[in-house]
Every structure is written in structure tokens, then in C-alpha cells.
Amino acid sequence: MNTFKTYADRAARHPNGCAKALFELMERKQTNLSIAADVTTKKELLHIADACGPYICILKTHIDIIDDFDEDLVAQLCELAKKHDFLLFEDRKFADIGNTVKHQYGKGVYKIASWAHITNAHTVPGEGIITGLREVGLPLGRGLLLLAEMSSKGALTKGSYTTESVEMARRNQDFVFGFIAQHKMNEKDDEDFVVMAPGVGLDVKGDGLGQQYRTPYQVIVESGCDVIIVGRGIYGNPDQIEFQAKRYKEAGWNAYLERVQKH
């Protein structure tokens, strides 16, 4: 199964350009860490991006919560992505009909498709949401993740919802290259979906607001996910951002090496 191959092997065989670029980057930097920078000021976001940049493969943003957003922020994020060799993932979670998301993705204040290598979407509206996003993103070489599972307590993303999300992805592999999920989604030998898992923590089990945490070992080795998404565990203490980023990078990479060796 592709999940158990090295990132380099998966990059060499992957038909999706965005997934190929991500796997090559992960192998090159020896990291499967994504930082979830859920902060509300331009200064904080840029500081986290620069401090964590050497240790991550992906910077995950919520650009619409930045109080002082401007076009210079996007320009600086793109420069930092080049400087430190990481991809930008706008965690937009699109959830409307195709014609609406097409404009939300390509136009408006944020013009997400112009700078974010990756974005994501709920599948609740049906397959039209993928069609609308693809129209904008595919010509730019962007990639889409579908939300198949979430890490919050009581989430409704399970059962038939998850199953149908996987089927939608299979029908749209030119643009959809993976999932936000809690375990591997590859069931066939000829498919290789990237799975990014939120809710990863080394020190805590929850946050009191429904978030549930698992360790990098649980996520990568036991559940077969590919990228660990970490937020407050890294930047919660401003004085330890680089230390924690390096710590999670090493934990995630060591878990990956163990998974590959086991198979």
C-alpha cells in the first residue's frame, strides 16, 4: 500500500502535481510537520512563519481572522515560503455551491487562489463544490483537500459522510490530492491520498473546547496519516516557538521512519 512507502517513492509516482511537490519537499527537509498559525495579527503570523519555517512543510493559515490583513502580508508570506521552503495552506473550509466558492476562492479581499498552494472544502454541498474550486485552482497548479474527518468531539464527519467524501476524491484526483482526516484513506493499491491530521499534541489530551489530541506516533504510525498539524503546542509559549517546532518536527519524522521500517 502506498501509505507505507517513503515520501520520495510516493513523489516519484504521484499523478497530482501538488502532492508530488509536497512529498518532494517533505523528503528534502525531512519534515512532516504543518503549523496551524491561528493568530489574529499580521505581526504574530509573520513571526511564527519565520521562526517555524525551517522545521515545517506547510504553514496553515486562517487568513480571515487577521485583524490587520493587507496585501503586504500575503507578499511577505510568499517570500517566507520561498526562503524556508514550505507550502501555504489556507484552511478556508469552503462549504457552498460551486458558483459561490469559485468567487470566494479567486476573488474578494483575500484572493486565496493567487497565493495558497493548498486549500480545503467540506463535501456537504455535493461534488459541484469541487468543480467550482477546480475551475480556479487547477490552472494555477493548486491542490484541494476534502474534510473527511475532524478532530473535535462530537463531529458529524463520520460514516457515510466520510465514505462519500472519499468517492468524490477518487473521481477528482487531478485536483483533489488528499484529506483532512484522522486515519489513512488509501484502500486501493493504485491510489495515494495525502492525509493531514489535526489535533496533534505531545503534552495535552484536550483544550476544554472539544479538541482532542493524539501524539505524532499515534497519528503517523498507528493511524497511517502523512502530515501532523500542530498549533498551540508550538506557539502557545512565545519563548519556546523554535524549540517546540524542532521537537514536533523530530517526533513526526521519527514516527514516519518507524512506519516505513515496519513495512
UniProtKB/Swiss-Prot annotation:
Belongs to the OMP decarboxylase family. It comes from the Eukaryota. PROSITE patterns: OMPDECASE. This is Orotidine 5'-phosphate decarboxylase. GO terms for biological process: 'de novo' pyrimidine nucleobase biosynthetic process; 'de novo' UMP biosynthetic process. The keyword Membrane does not apply. The gene is PYR4. It catalyses: orotidine 5'-phosphate + H(+) = UMP + CO2.
